[in-house]
Structure formats: structure tokens, C-alpha cells
């Protein structure tokens, strides 16, 4: 059974945050996001990292930790903390983020340096981690009650659990003057209370190698599912691996399963799933079958079941080194490809990159204007000083959003949309502008437990180790539908 709070949360995520994004895109001011997800449980707490790390920041799957929060009221007796006014006394902000590749790491350091220069009493201690390391570490720290002052979040069910446990602050009163300028705030708000702010949003689509497509006599990924399957065979016949995927990390593969759900269930069906937690529907089962149909064509690179997203022999490395023709990934893909080759910008790739939306599926309730994506933001920890909220507001201010957009395009602040000039990100921006609905990544949208089960069942489907019916039943059982 869904609690009243959970129901309101899901309605807000699917409708409010999503339609806010669409309104921004259609108005000509839009934003762009990368997605990642809740956390793993059993891992050591993070060591503060230096500001240069080697692995690209990615989007990844949630963890399977405790049972989903189902209490009618927050799990602790305490009300969420609220930010107080700045005292002007020396204060330290503990900031965790996952922008661990250049130039993003240096740009974030510059943002912190600028804020500290304007606020001499503030010291910002930055911990930079790779995505999966972050998710494991934040879960460990949360369990110990040692919450960073400001940390990466994707909103959704994982944040709702943190709210219920009293681990994050209600900052509604402090951010009301900026929240209206941002797309995706609904992902960080429950029952009219706001706990964080988005700094970028975006959607998933196909990144494809135009040169390899041309070698196979193709122009771009097909706009129908059946056409895409035909292209897979055409590419194989030309001696080209059609698709790169990091099924070992699970979350990259879940993009396929989830996007097929969106196409087959449609926006109404996805909202119904959110309301009743029941995945045992014909459209979900058909989505699983279509995953199996794709797998049967053997379209992926060798070793895909054990491959990760960001390793040299993983999904992004395979694409970067022209080992596959296309990749279903978020707008952060080009940056990851460039990073694999030691480049600062994807426009310098030694091959021509293109973007295309996910295809339409014949007979499905979904339409091409319904998309799949998510938000990245920062949440304020329960013991954070007021200056942490001020720093968060600084991060999402138009000028800083424009600065960040140099390497992380599609900012959440609609006033900074004019900073989007990268041709690859403009392609995603155009895709966003066509949307009437955007479904948040399922492994973020639901609780970490449910999201983790979506990813687990996806991995089994990609390994042809389960049936569509059993996959849907397993997710439903975890969700309590």
C-alpha cells in the first residue's frame, strides 16, 4: 500500500517536476541533466578526495538496503531541521560531489573558491568521488548519522527515505526566492517542503557514431523499434558491433527496459504504476519481452554482462574507441567519451557524433513526445550551517549556472539557458523541447530497494536468465504492489 506521503511524492515527481521541465523547454529556456542514483550499503565511509579523479562521473543504480519507508509519518520523531541565519563566525561546509573528471572538477573548485572569497568566514571542504563510490559512502555515512552538509542527490525515493529519517533539512523558507527559476525542484520536494535544489536536468537518447552508421549504409537510429532491430542486423552484417552497454553496472541496461515501459505503457500507465506499485501489467511484461528480443540478436560488445559504464573496456570506453555504433545514454555521454580519449570536449572526438531519440514502439500506448530522464541536485544535511544553504543558492544562480554549463550543459536555472552552445547538448535540448511528459529514471524515482530490483531484473533479462513475467513479479513484490 502507498502511504499518503509517498503518493503525493510520486505524483509530484511524475507531473510537477516533469511538466516544469517541459514548460521550460517549450519556453526556450531549458536545462540538462545527468542522472545517477541512490546508494549502496556496505562500503567504507569516503575519504576526502583530491579534486582530480580518474573515472568519469556517471549515472548509476540505487542500492538494495533496508525495506522501503512505509510509515504514515516520518520514521523519526523529530521534525526535519531548518536552516538558521548565518552567524558570521568561522564555519566549514562539508561538500560531496561526483564531478570527478576535468574540466568539471576544476570548475567546481573554482565555484567554491569564488564563494569563499565572497564569504571570508566560510571554508568549503570538498570530497570528490566517482559515482558508485559516492553512493556506497553516502549510505554508510547516513547509517552512522554522519551526514555531509551538502551532497549530491537525484531526489526521488532515496531522498524521501532520508527525509523520513530526519537526515536532511527543510530549506523551503530559505530558497523560495530562487526555486521558481529552476526546473526539476519537484524532485526534491515532498508535502510542500523542499530539501534540495537541482542544478541540471536532462534526458536519455541514442548517441551514435555517424561514421560507423555510414559504413553500414545507414543515416541515423531508426524512429521505430522494429526499424532499430533491422538496423542492428544491418550493422552486424557490416562487421560493426551495433550497441555498447555496461550491463555489469546494471543501471545503463535499465535505460532500455525502462524506456520500453514508457513507450508501451505511456504516460498514463507510468503514473498508474507509480500509484499502485504494480508492475505486473501487460505493457511491462511486453517491455521485458522486447529486451529479450534485442538480446537474442547478440547486438552488444563482447563481455557486456560484466562491463561497467566508465571503464576503458566498458560502455563509454567502447563507444569512445569506436567499438560500437550506438549507445543509449544520458546527455553526459559525450563528455565521458571525450574523457576516455583524454580530450576536454566531445567536439574534438576523432569521429562524428550524433544524437537521436528513443524509437516509437508499434502498438504501445506511449508516443514520441514522452521521454525518460532525470535531475541532479544537492541536498542539505541535517546539521549543515546556514551558509551551506547560501552556497547551494549560489550554485544555482544564473551566473554560476552559465559558468558550469561550459562543461555540464543544460543548467536547471532557466535564466542560464542561453549558455547552452555545445552542439551535442543542443541536440538533447531540442529533444527536451518536444516533450509533453518526462519519466524520471526508475531506479531513482522509486525507493532504493525498488530501484535496485528494477536494475537487478534488468541485468537478468540482459543475461537471458529470467522471464518478463518473473521480472515484473519480482519488482512488484519488492514495491509492495
Language model features with spans:
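A structural signal for short loop-to-beta-strand junctions that line the ligand-binding cleft
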Residues: 141, 148-149, 177-212, 241-244, ...
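Glycine-centered hinge/linker elements that transmit conformational signals in sensory
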Residues: 232, 275-306, 358
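C-terminal capping/gating helix-and-loop segments adjacent to ligand/active sites or protein-protein/ligand interfaces
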Residues: 407-418, 426-480
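Extracytoplasmic/periplasmic substrate-recognition and gating elements
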Residues: 117, 216, 341-407
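Conserved N-terminal structural module of periplasmic/extracytoplasmic solute-binding proteins
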Residues: 27-28, 32-160, 347, 387, ...
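Extracytoplasmic/periplasmic solute-binding protein
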Residues: 81, 191, 195-197, 204, ...
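Hinge/lid segment of periplasmic solute-binding proteins
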Residues: 154-204, 223, 229, 256, ...
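Short, solvent-exposed loop/beta-turn-alpha elements that line the ligand-binding surface or hinge
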Residues: 169-182, 247, 264-286, 341-348, ...
Amino acid at each position: 500500500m502507498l502511504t499518503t506521503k509517498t503518493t503525493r511524492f510520486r505524483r509530484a515527481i511524475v507531473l510537477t517536476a516533469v511538466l516544469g521541465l517541459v514548460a521550460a523547454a517549450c519556453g526556450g529556456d531549458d536545462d540538462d541533466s545527468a542522472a545517477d542514483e541512490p546508494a549502496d550499503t556496505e562500503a567504507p565511509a569516503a575519504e576526502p578526495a583530491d579534486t582530480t579523479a580518474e573515472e568519469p562521473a556517471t549515472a548509476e543504480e540505487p542500492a538494495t538496503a533496508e525495506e522501503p519507508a512505509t510509515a504514515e509519518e516520518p520514521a523519526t520523531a523529530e521534525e526535519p531541521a531548518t536552516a538558521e541565519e548565518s552567524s558570521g563566525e568561522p564555519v566549514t561546509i562539508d561538500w560531496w560531489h561526483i564531478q570527478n573528471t576535468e574540466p568539471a572538477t576544476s570548475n567546481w573548485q573554482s565555484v567554491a573558491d569564488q564563494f569563499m572569497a565572497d564569504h571570508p568566514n566560510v571554508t568549503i571542504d570538498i570530497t570528490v568521488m566517482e559515482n558508485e563510490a559516492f553512493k556506497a559512502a553516502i549510505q554508510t555515512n547516513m547509517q552512522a548519522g554522519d551526514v555531509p552538509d551538502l551532497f549530491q542527490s537525484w531526489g526521488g525515493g532515496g531522498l524521501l527515505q532520508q527525509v523520513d529519517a530526519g537526515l536532511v533539512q527543510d530549506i523551503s523558507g530559505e530558497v523560495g526566492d530562487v526555486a521558481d527559476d529552476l526546473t526539476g525542484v519537484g524532485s526534491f520536494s515532498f508535502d510542500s517542503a523542499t530539501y534540495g535544489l537541482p542544478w541540471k536536468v536532462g534526458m536519455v537518447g541514442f548517441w551514435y557514431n555517424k561514421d560507423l552508421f555510414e559504413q553500414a549504409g545507414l543515416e541515423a537510429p531508426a524512429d521505430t523499434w522494429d526499424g532499430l532491430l533491422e538496423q542492428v542486423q544491418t550493422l552486424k552484417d557490416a562487421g560493426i558491433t551495433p550497441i555498447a552497454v555496461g550491463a555489469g553496472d546494471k543501471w545503463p541496461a535499465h535505460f532500455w527496459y525502462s524506456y520500453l515501459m514508457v513507450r508501451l505503457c505511456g504516460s498514463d500507465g507510468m503514473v498508474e504504476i507509480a500509484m499502485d506499485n504494480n508492475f505486473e501489467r501487460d505493457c511491462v511484461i511486453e517491455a521485458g519481452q522486447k529486451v529479450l528480443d534485442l538480446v537474442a540478436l547478440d547486438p552488444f560488445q563482447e563481455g557486456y554482462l560484466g562491463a561497467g559504464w566508465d571503464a576503458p573496456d566498458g560502455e563509454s570506453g567502447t563507444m569512445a574507441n569506436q567499438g560500437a555504433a550506438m549507445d543509449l545514454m544520458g546527455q553526459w555521454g559525450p563528455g565521458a567519451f571525450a574523457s576516455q580519449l583524454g580530450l576536454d570536449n566531445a567536439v574534438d572526438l576523432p569521429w562524428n557524433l550524433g544524437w537521436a531519440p528513443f524509437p516509437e514502439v508499434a502498438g504501445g500506448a506511449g508516443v514520441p513526445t514522452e521521454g525518460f530522464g532525470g535531475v541532479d541536485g544537492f541536498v542539505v544535511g541535517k546539521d549543515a550551517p546556514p551558509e551551506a544553504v547560501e552556497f547551494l543558492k549560489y550554485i544555482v544562480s544564473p551566473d554560476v549556472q552559465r559558468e558550469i554549463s561550459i562543461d555540464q550543459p543544460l543548467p536547471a536555472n532557466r535564466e542560464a539557458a542561453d549558455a547552452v552552445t555545445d552542439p551535442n547538448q543542443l541536440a538533447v535540448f531540442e529533444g527536451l523541447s518536444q516533450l509533453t511528459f518526462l519519466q524520471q529514471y526508475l531506479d531513482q524515482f522509486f525507493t532504493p530497494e525498488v530501484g535496485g530490483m528494477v536494475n537487478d531484473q534488468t541485468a537478468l533479462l540482459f543475461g537471458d536468465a529470467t522471464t518478463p513475467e518473473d521480472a515484473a513479479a519480482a519488482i512488484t513484490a519488492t514495491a509492495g504492489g
